[in-house]
């Protein structure tokens, strides 16, 4: 299967997971996995949440920002991956003046 994100419509989600501002996403989902190309606008956040029944892999394609992971804050930049296993909490923060673009995969347990 080939997923062509150029052909998938972008959906804008205000206050995603209780976060600030908005995240735009191009998504594919089936019963086992969600695959997303996401964009956090400057100043936007993905709200702090715990993964129950899934994990998440985030690969930064453009920009940089911060990850909150189990109470620890760390910087993340283009080319790096953040992994949040099931049962752990995290948030992604774009604290810059440029879009933060990332690829995310959420396999369902």
Locations of the language-model features?
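Conserved short histidine dyad/triad with adjacent acidic residue
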Residues: 21, 36-51
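Ligand-binding loop in jelly-roll beta-barrel domains
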Residues: 86-109
